[in-house]
Design a protein with these regions (language model features):
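Generic beta-strand structural signal
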Residues: 85, 97, 111-115, 123, ...
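A short, surface-exposed beta-strand/turn
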Residues: 98-106
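Auxiliary Fe-S-binding modules of radical SAM enzymes
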Residues: 1-94, 103, 255-263, 271-354
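Short linear Ser/Thr-Pro motifs
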Residues: 79-80, 116-117, 203, 226
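Canonical Radical SAM [4Fe-4S] cluster-binding loop centered on the CxxxCxxC motif
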Residues: 105-143, 149-150
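Conserved AdoMet/S-adenosylmethionine-binding subsite of the radical SAM
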Residues: 152-325, 329-331
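Short, surface-exposed helix/turn micro-motifs that flank interaction/cofactor sites
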Residues: 39, 99, 122, 126-129, ...
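Alpha-helix N-cap/helix-start and coil->helix boundary motif
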Residues: 122, 207-209, 232, 340-344
Length: 354
C-alpha cells in the first residue's frame, strides 16, 4: 500500500534563503568575511540587513547577489480574547502558512510560538483541518527560521531567552525532517538565537521512520506523540498513518527513543465525542502506556471543532471522567486549555485555501 508520506513533499528551487544557512553553509558558498560572524549578524540583527552596521558592504552585496534575504510577509493577524494571535504568513511563491503566537497567561514576557513545517499536510487526520488541504510542499529551513524571526520582530519576545517553540502548526515535521532539523540546528546555534533544544518540541502523528532518524540526530528536540486512539481500528480510521505504523510498532519506536535519549515524552490525546472518550478508552490508554504512564505526560486535548471535520468536542463530564480515570490508574495527566479557539487558531484548526 502506498501512502502520501512515502514520497518526499515537493521542494522549492532557487537561491538559498540566507536565514536557513549555517556558518558552514556560508563558508562553502564562498561568503567573504568570517562565516560565524556573518551568521550571527543574520540571526541576531536581521531587521537591519539592508543597512547593516556590523557587516561590510562587500558581505552585504555578496548576500544580496547569492542568497534570498526575504522573510515571510505578515499578511494578516487575528487576535484572540485570550491574548494569542494567529498570524497568516505569505511566502515568496504566494503560498500561505499559519503561525500562532501565545504569550503566557501570567504576567511575564515568555511566549510560545506554534510554528509550521509544511504547506498543508500529507497525513490526512480526520480531526485536523490542515489534513484536509493535502500536501502542497515542504518549508525550507529558512522559511521555518523566518517564522520565528518575523514573529519576534513584530510581536515579541524581544529576547530568545523567553521563547518556547512547538512544531505543532501546519504539516508533519518528520515528513520534512531534514529541513526541520536544520532549522533546529540554526535556532539553537550558540552564535545565533541560542534557543535550547529543550525548549523546542516536535509533535508527530507517529511517523516511525522519522522518530528513529531523529533519535540519532543532534541537537535533538523534545518529542510529542499525537496518539488519539487506543485501538488500531479507531486510530486507522482517524489517522491513516496507523495503517502503515500501528500502535505496536509506534510503541516499540518510542521504547527505543527513551532507551537512546533518556528523555521524557508527551502523549497528545485529542478527545472526540463518542470516538475515543469512553471509560474503557481511558483504561486501554493506561494499559498501552504501561510503565510510561508514571513519568511521561498525557496531554488531553478536547476536540476543537471546525468546518473541515464532523468530529465534536467531548462533554465536560466525559472529559472529567476520562482524566480522573487516568489519574486513578497512575498516569501523569494534564488537560490543555485551548488557546485561540475564537479565531480558529487552536490545535487542529489551522488551514488555508480549503
Amino acid at each position: 500500500m502506498n501512502f502520501a508520506w512515502d514520497q518526499p513533499a515537493p521542494e522549492r528551487k532557487g537561491r538559498p534563503n540566507a536565514f536557513g544557512l549555517t556558518p558552514e553553509d556560508l563558508e562553502s558558498l564562498g561568503c567573504p568575511g568570517r562565516s560565524q560572524h556573518v551568521f550571527s549578524q543574520l540571526q541576531r540583527q536581521w531587521q537591519w540587513i539592508e543597512e547593516h552596521p556590523f557587516l561590510s558592504k562587500e558581505v552585504r552585496y555578496w548576500l544580496e547577489d547569492h542568497t534570498d534575504l526575504s522573510l515571510p510577509i505578515l499578511s494578516q493577524a487575528l487576535h484572540s480574547e485570550d491574548g494569542s494571535t494567529k498570524c497568516i504568513l505569505s511566502l515568496n511563491d504566494g503560498e500561505l502558512i499559519e503561525v500562532v503566537h501565545m504569550p503566557r497567561e501570567v504576567k511575564t514576557s515568555r511566549v510560545t510560538l506554534c510554528i509550521s513545517s509544511q504547506v498543508g499536510c500529507a497525513m490526512g487526520c480526520t480531526f485536523c483541518a490542515t489534513g484536509a488541504m493535502g500536501i502542497k510542499r515542504n518549508l525550507e529551513s529558512g522559511e521555518i527560521v523566518g517564522q520565528v524571526l518575523l514573529l519576534m520582530k513584530t510581536l515579541g519576545p524581544k529576547t530568545p531567552d523567553h521563547l518556547t517553540l512547538v512544531f505543532m502548526g501546519m504539516g508533519e515535521p518528520l515528513h520534512n525532517l531534514m529541513n526541520v532539523h536544520k532549522a533546529i540546528q540554526i535556532l539553537s546555534h550558540s552564535h545565533g538565537l541560542n534557543i535550547s533544544p529543550k525548549r523546542i518540541t516536535v509533535s508527530t502523528s507517529g511517523l516511525v521512520s522519522g522518530i528513529e532518524r531523529l533519535a540519532r540526530m543532534t541537537p535533538r528536540p523534545l518529542l510529542a506523540i499525537s496518539l488519539n486512539a487506543t485501538t488500531d481500528e479507531v486510530r486507522s480510521s482517524s489517522m491513516p498513518i496507523n495503517r502503515a505504523y500501528n500502535l505496536s510498532q509506534l510503541r516499540h519506536a518510542l521504547d527505543s527513543w527513551i532507551l537512546k535519549t533518556n528523555e521524557k515524552l508527551t502523549f497528545e490525546y485529542v478527545l472526540m465525542r463518542g470516538v475515543n472518550d469512553s471509560y474503557l478508552d481511558a483504561h486501554r490508554l493506561s494499559e498501552w502506556l504501561g510503565e510510561l504512564r508514571h513519568q511521561h505526560n498525557v496531554n488531553l486535548i478536547p476536540m476543537n471543532e471546525h468546518r473541515a471535520s464532523d468530529q465534536k468536542e467531548p462533554s465536560r463530564e466525559s472529559l472529567e471522567i476520562f482524566s480522573r480515570t487516568l489519574r486513578d490508574l497512575g498516569c501523569f495527566v494534564t488537560v490543555r486549555k485551548s488557546r485561540g479557539r475564537d479565531i480558529q487558531a487552536a490545535c487542529g484548526q489551522l488551514i488555508r485555501n480549503l
